[in-house]
Regions:
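C-terminal partner/receptor-binding element of secreted or periplasmic proteins
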Residues: 184-219
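Aromatic-patch recognition
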Residues: 34-187
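Eukaryotic, compositionally biased intrinsically disordered regions
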Residues: 11, 29-30
Length: 219
């Protein structure tokens, strides 16, 4: 059976391949389709950032499926590029989000896997930072990087931004990590590390820092 696809339509479908994904649900089921644009934080001014998304079976399908971070394990983009030879992956993880009432509060969000090592993985995501001053409320889009430790057992889904790694939040779980992390960019070697981290522009430095911390703990 041969189906004729007009060249213009074929090109249109091809142009949408960057949206093609395989979504793994918490049930283990895999759903293939095309994720709708505008689900990232940039377009989430009035809803939870990086929490829900919509997809369709084909680029032009009218039937829309909606999923949340509570329903999925990960979103794997099928398109491979030079910068992402394995494809882009968004994972559903718990973000450490302490509050005055609960130091250990977490919120489940979708975060993009940036790099993974033997003992930890690092992620990035964007969210809105809201500040209030005499002029009123100011919103700005901020890119965050965070680290997830592989040895936390059932709690291994938690992703911590550097500021929280440097806090008392991990005092009991990772003795000495707070001080080790704070000193990572200090001194002559630290300045060289900071320069390299700034040039990279990602969170990979956290993997190096954590490996060095583990090596020190093993002595």
């Amino acid at each position: 059976l041969c189906v004729y696809i007009p060249q213009a339509n074929a090109q249109k479908v091809k142009d949408q391949e960057f949206r093609r994904v395989v979504v793994t649900l918490t049930s283990g089921e895999k759903v293939e389709g095309y994720v709708k644009r505008g689900w990232h934080a940039e377009a989430s001014a009035f809803k939870k950032s990086n929490y829900s998304f919509k997809m369709t079976a084909t680029p032009d399908d009218k039937e829309v499926l909606k999923y949340t971070a509570d329903e999925v394990v990960c979103i794997d983009y099928t398109e491979k590029t030079e910068n992402n030879p394995d494809g882009i992956r968004w994972e559903s993880r718990e973000l450490a989000s302490p509050s005055i009432a609960d130091r250990y509060r977490t919120i489940r969000r979708l975060v993009c896997l940036e790099n993974t090592g033997e003992h930890a993985s690092v992620y990035w995501w964007k969210d809105w930072d809201v500040t209030t001053n005499q002029q009123g409320m100011k919103r700005r889009l901020v890119t965050y990087h965070g680290i997830r430790f592989h040895d936390e057992g059932k709690e291994g889904e938690i992703v911590y931004i550097p500021m929280l790694v440097n806090s008392v939040l991990l005092k009991d779980k990772k003795p000495g990590l707070k001080e080790f992390s704070k000193n990572w960019f200090k001194g002559k070697e630290g300045k060289a590390r900071k320069k390299e981290a700034d040039a990279d522009g990602d969170g990979t430095w956290m993997l190096d820092m954590y490996e060095a911390y583990l090596a020190q703990q093993a002595k």
